[in-house]
């Protein structure tokens, strides 16, 4: 379970970076060259999703919970926004959903 969760967090980080870099280019007039590492990051994101031992839809559903948590960490660390009680509560609920889905992988 820990290996799967860490893999999900790595996957989420690749997706967020792959989306953040084009956002910087479009919204903040950053260099167009940011699209190159963004593409690499998104390709790595897709590859990491294939490493999970479950049906794709189940992987995507469970991954969503970890993505929420990772995005909130990004919000705090990169964007510098203080998390609210609602952020923490939502992250906890999303992470519990992910754990329930992953716990059932070997039982179907």
Curated annotation (Swiss-Prot):
Bridged cysteine pairs (disulfide): none
Listed Pfam families: UPF0060
TM helices/strands, residue ranges: 6-26, 31-51, 61-81, 85-105
Matching InterPro entries: UPF0060
Periplasmic side: 1-5, 52-60, 106-108
Subcellular location per the Swiss-Prot or TrEMBL entry: Cell inner membrane
Coiled-coil regions listed in the entry: none
SUPFAM superfamilies, per database record: Multidrug resistance efflux transporter EmrE
A GO CC annotation given for this chain: plasma membrane
Keyword terms: Cell inner membrane, Cell membrane, Membrane, Transmembrane, Transmembrane helix
Annotated NCBIfam families: PRK02237.1 (NF002586)
HAMAP family per record: UPF0060 (MF_00010)
Name by which UniProt lists this protein: UPF0060 membrane protein YnfA
Species classification: Bacteria, Pseudomonadati, Pseudomonadota, Gammaproteobacteria, Enterobacterales
């Amino acid at each position: 379970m820990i290996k799967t969760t860490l893999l999900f967090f790595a996957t989420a980080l690749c997706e967020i970076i792959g989306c953040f870099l084009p956002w910087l280019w479009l919204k903040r007039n950053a260099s167009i060259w940011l699209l190159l590492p963004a593409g690499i990051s998104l390709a790595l994101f897709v590859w990491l999703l294939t490493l999970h031992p479950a049906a794709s839809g189940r992987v995507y559903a469970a991954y969503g919970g970890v993505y929420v948590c990772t995005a909130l960490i990004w919000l705090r660390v990169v964007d510098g926004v203080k998390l609210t009680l609602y952020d923490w509560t939502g992250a906890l609920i999303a992470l519990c959903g992910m754990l329930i889905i992953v716990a059932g992988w070997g039982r179907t």
